Amino acid sequence: MPRSIEPDEVLSILAHIALPPTAPYHEWGVLDAIRSELERGGIPTKTDPFGQVHARVSAGGAKRALVFAAHTDHPAFEVIEASGKAGKARVLGGFRQRVFPPDVAVTVHGDAGCASFAAILTEPVADIEPLHNSTTVCRIDAEKPLAVGQFAVLDLPAADVAGDEIRMRAADDLAGCALIVSVLLALRGERAPHDVHAIFTRAEETGLYGARLAAEDGLLPRDAYVISVEASRALPGAEAGRGIVVRAGDLHNTFSNEAERYLRVARERLAERGIPTQRALLVGGTCEASSFVRLGWTATGIALPNINYHNAAADGGFAPEIVRLGDLLSGIALGVEAALAAGEDADESWWPDVRITPTVIRERLQRDRPKG
């Protein structure tokens, strides 16, 4: 049976990765945390020309390699004008709150690691900037002087755990990053053939940019199958608490049936162990699998059902995103089993029975119509 990883260790990994503030183009703290967790576990990492972290675990002669991909950013704000303690901040990424609250508490950060400080966002104004997937500019008033290029994140808990519920400032997609790290750690010492690559991407929320660059520049093995790992909007049929979701597609694209084959094999194996999983077309957003599919790669996805996706509270304002520990553990188990299924190029159990039409049926359908 494949190695597993204890829930307490998973939560420790998640807490470490979730702690640093992050935003599109400002993911350095999260990337450092991911690198630290992997290297502490004996898994070497490398960094590509775009600052994205890569890792790999393998054993034996795997018949197919997999690439797990998750992004290290989350919608946030960037200071675009500054005059003392006041200025303007632009939304970066997909905050589409139905009601933008009159006062939004944030914390301000710099990429060089300067001490953070509190600020308030007010006076939101519609200002469309497609390059950064941005719809809004706000006034920002801070406790300390501001500087253009600083970024601000919602003043919410990084990761609070209450039973099975994990309330996060940025479950999308730091929970997905923690899932992949846990899969790699769980595969250490596994002797069955497997070849698993991971990429932790940047600037997904503003345009899938990191994944697009990886695909455009061939930064991953071209014959590997890519699996995007997300914390995507919980929907009917893809509900929190019912296991990881095998994602057949997203808002814009249907993914690869061939890449999904290994996930389906993994689902069968997990079902035998009583581990729940789901399968759905998730139209709540667009994920990095779309980048790879549209650029000619074989790709699919999995997702953690995410309540309050992109911090959208029920009242229209901002709230922590919520994922379930059970779903996270389900996703780790699915990732490990999919890696082993790819290593042996496994098929679903039912496929051999239907691969070739029975001769008796072929012959029956070839008979001429009886004459009356």
Predicted regions and their residues:
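N-terminal hydrophobic/helix-forming segments and targeting peptides
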Residues: 1-372
